Regions:
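PRPP-associated nucleotide enzymes
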Residues: 1-226
Length: 226
C-alpha cells in the first residue's frame, strides 16, 4: 500500500491492482484519527480496485473506551467509529476491545479475538502468583492469563476515575500480595497512570516481583517512564 500526505494535511492511499476479483483483507490499527481516515480510504480503494470482498482487521480499535456518553452533550464515539468502518467492509475482526459491547455498534458481522492468554508466554517461574487487573472490568483478562500460566490467584483493584479532571484513585480489593509475585493485567496502557499507581500500591504492600502486562501498549507521552 502506498500512502501520500498533501500539503493541506489530507491523505490518499493506493492499493495494488492485484486485489481485483479477490478478497481484500485490510489490517490497520486505528491508533489515531488519521488512521481512522486511512482505513476508510483503504476500504474504498479496495472496492474501487475490484475486490469481491473486504475484510477489515483492526487489532487495536481506537475510541473503544468511549462506549457511552459519560457527560451531557458527548457522543458515543465508539459507535460512530464502528458505523463508519461498517460502511466499507463485509466483516470486521478486532482484538480485545476495551468494551466487548462495541461489537453491537457494527452494522456488519464482527469477530473478537482474545489475545490475553499470550501474555503468559514470557512470564518466568512465579512464586505464589497473583494475577491482578486494575479494575473489576478487566478481571476476565486476569483469569485468562492465570489460566494460560496454569497456576495462581486472581483479584482486582478498585478504581475510580474523575471524568472532569481525568484523575484516577486506586485502592486494594483484598487479596494478600505480601511476598508474592504479582502480574498486573490490562487491555490497554495509555498514559500509564493506572499501572504506575497499581505498582506503587503493591510496593506499599510488600509484594515480591511485579510484572506489568497488557494487550495494547499505547504508551502515550511518558507512560513508559511512569
Amino acid at each position: 500500500v502506498e500512502y501520500e500526505r498533501f500539503a493541506d494535511g489530507e491523505h490518499v492511499v493506493r492499493v495494488p491492482e492485484a486485489v481485483a476479483g479477490e478478497r481484500a483483507t485490510i489490517v490497520a490499527s486505528t491508533v489515531d484519527s488519521d488512521a481512522h481516515v486511512q482505513v476508510l480510504q483503504l476500504q474504498d480503494a479496495a472496492r474501487e480496485a475490484g475486490a469481491t470482498e473486504v475484510v477489515t482487521v483492526v487489532p487495536y480499535m481506537g475510541y473503544a473506551r468511549q462506549d457511552e456518553a459519560f457527560r451531557d452533550g458527548e457522543p458515543v464515539s465508539s459507535r460512530a467509529m464502528a458505523r463508519a468502518i461498517s460502511t466499507g467492509t463485509d466483516r470486521v475482526i478486532t482484538v480485545n476491545p476495551h468494551e466487548p459491547a462495541v461489537y453491537d455498534f457494527f452494522d456488519v458481522p464482527a469477530t473478537l479475538v482474545d489475545a490475553a492468554g499470550l501474555l503468559a508466554d514470557p512470564l518466568p517461574a512465579l512464586s505464589e502468583p497473583l494475577f491482578l487487573s486494575p479494575d473489576e472490568g478487566a478481571i476476565g483478562l486476569a483469569h485468562t492469563v492465570r489460566d494460560a500460566y496454569g497456576a495462581g490467584e486472581t483479584d482486582f483493584f478498585e478504581k475510580e476515575r474523575d471524568y472532569d479532571t481525568g484523575d484516577i484513585e486506586i485502592s486494594t480489593n483484598g487479596a494478600p500480595a505480601e511476598g508474592r509475585d504479582v502480574v498486573l493485567v490490562d487491555d490497554i496502557i495509555a498514559t500509564g497512570s493506572t499501572m504506575s499507581e497499581s505498582v506503587a500500591v503493591l510496593d506499599d504492600r510488600d509484594a515480591g516481583r511485579v510484572f506489568v502486562t497488557c494487550v495494547h501498549p499505547m504508551l502515550a507521552s511518558n507512560a513508559l517512564t511512569k
